[in-house]
């Protein structure tokens, strides 16, 4: 019996904040493993998604949106993580927002092309472009930048758009043993998953009021056989003013955040959950 060759590689998704990287990852994997919102810098750390189809395993890394210093247009915050992550890549997916090419896109491109790793560029959110004729001159503009392996105009929200993308990715995966079992869709720990579920509700409920430095820390995570899950989490903010914003009038906001977070945790883990949230300031 002939043994099938196996293929496996890392695919890094990069781009400015809020271009749709997390939406793309979730739709490729077929499950929500990365939180999505309109707020910039929703993704604060690398999210790994794994897609195994037959003898192909693609390991996707959704990186935090690249942030720039307003004064000098230099990359900041996640710069070191950006460089370290690209070192393991088989392929880089560079996402841009429609035909809005900026100096920041130019800087990101200049950095990733130094890696000599094949780059596929995605023009995302084309469903928001009413006059599709303007796409062609923009694609020609991109072709003059570097020799991209492909330039794909898509809407990351539409799964039907992703068939061609996944086929291109498969063609670039090297012959390798699979790193993860077929059932794996992410390397995220349960602690991380719970903290992200809570943080997603903070983003949705607080919107522009959300302190950018907010952090969710899982203090305890205990499972009583298969009966119930007991979680205590701390929401860290910078000062008393931010603390009052998160708690809300008479504690109404934090109650709603806690209730919906608990429901979403129960749906994720298929177990009754008891969730206690504390809001603390670092002063």
Curated annotation (Swiss-Prot):
Keywords for the protein's UniProt record, in alphabetical order: Cell membrane, Cytoplasm, GTP-binding, Membrane, Nucleotide-binding, Ribosome biogenesis, RNA-binding, rRNA-binding
GO molecular function: GTP binding; GTPase activity; ribosomal small subunit binding; small ribosomal subunit rRNA binding
UniProt cross-references to InterPro entries, sorted A to Z: G_ERA_dom, GTP-bd, GTPase_Era-like, KH_dom-like_a/b, KH_dom_type_2, KH_sf_prok-type, P-loop_NTPase, Small_GTP-bd
Keyword hit for Kinase: no
Record's subcellular location: Cytoplasm; Cell membrane
Membrane topology, record value: Peripheral membrane protein
Region (G1): 15-22
Gene Ontology CC: cytosol; plasma membrane
Region annotation (G2) ranges: 41-45
Region of interest (G5), ranges: 154-156
Binding-site positions, GTP: 15-22, 62-66, 124-127
Any one Pfam family match given in the protein's UniProt record, by short name: MMR_HSR1
GO BP field: ribosomal small subunit assembly
Gene3D superfamilies xref list: 3.30.300.20, P-loop containing nucleotide triphosphate hydrolases (3.40.50.300)
Region (G4): 124-127
Residue ranges of domain KH type-2 in the record: 198-283
Sequence ranges assigned to domain Era-type G in this UniProt record: 7-175
Region (G3): 62-65
Annotated function: An essential GTPase that binds both GDP and GTP, with rapid nucleotide exchange. Plays a role in 16S rRNA processing and 30S ribosomal subunit biogenesis and possibly also in cell cycle regulation and energy metabolism.
Family statement: Belongs to the TRAFAC class TrmE-Era-EngA-EngB-Septin-like GTPase superfamily. Era GTPase family.
Summary of subunit composition and partner proteins: Monomer.
PANTHER family reported in the protein's UniProt record: GTPASE ERA, GTPASE ERA, MITOCHONDRIAL
Name the record gives this protein: GTPase Era
UniProt lineage: Bacteria, Pseudomonadati, Pseudomonadota, Gammaproteobacteria, Enterobacterales
